[in-house]
Amino acid sequence: MMNQDSLALIKQSIKTIPDYPIPGIMFRDVTSLLENAEAYKATIAILVAHYQSKGFTKVVGTEARGFLFGAPLALELGVGFVPVRKPGKLPRKTISQTYDLEYGKDTLEIHVDAINANDKVLVIDDLLATGGTIEATVKLIRELGGEVSHAAFVISLPEIGGEKRLQGMGIEVLSLCEFDGE
């Protein structure tokens, strides 16, 4: 059971910026949570408590804000942290996955030796909207032989459908707070 006071603190710490980056969008700014040490600590503590007994061997965070939650979570769980990045940012041999955006395509990469067939992987990012980034990340992990069945997010925008998309891939989703709209 998650501490409701901590969850309320987390949600209250996330500022909403209207009409950013374009008119009609209500941007959920997770950096305001990071500025609040108590809220940031509560976020990591809730995630650790939820996942500490699940047997994960790696935490994978997506560029860039997934790193801010994934690295401290991995440290607290005592497992390795693996970054998934935009093309050309990782120095060793990589594999890539291209995915669709609303207006175009994007690509993510992971080191080929970062995940192996014995790894049980938790994926984390700051926000779940369409689920495209995490779908691509899951495909990369599975291509390397890793087992991935859980993804965690600080924020979810359930109306956009990302959770259903990930559940369709066999991913159990945890979101610490939900907001309406885009």
UniProtKB/Swiss-Prot annotation:
Cysteine pairs bridged by disulfides in the record: none
EC number of this enzyme: 2.4.2.7
Classification via PROSITE patterns: PUR_PYR_PR_TRANSFER
Highest taxon listed in the record's lineage: Bacteria
Keywords per UniProt: Cytoplasm, Glycosyltransferase, Purine salvage, Transferase
Top-level EC class as recorded in UniProt: transferase
One Pfam short name: Pribosyltran
InterPro entries, per the entry: Ade_phspho_trans, PRibTrfase_dom, PRTase-like, UPRTase/APRTase
Pathway assigned in UniProt: Purine metabolism; AMP biosynthesis via salvage pathway; AMP from adenine: step 1/1
Primary location recorded for the protein, binned into one broad class: cytoplasm
Catalytic activity: AMP + diphosphate = 5-phospho-alpha-D-ribose 1-diphosphate + adenine
Family of the protein in this entry: Belongs to the purine/pyrimidine phosphoribosyltransferase family.
Biological role stated in the UniProt entry: Catalyzes a salvage reaction resulting in the formation of AMP, that is energically less costly than de novo synthesis.
NCBIfam families: apt, PRK02304.1-1, PRK02304.1-3, PRK02304.1-5
Subunit details: Homodimer.
Name listed for the protein in its UniProt record: Adenine phosphoribosyltransferase
Organism lineage: Bacteria, Pseudomonadati, Pseudomonadota, Gammaproteobacteria, Alteromonadales
Gene for this chain: apt
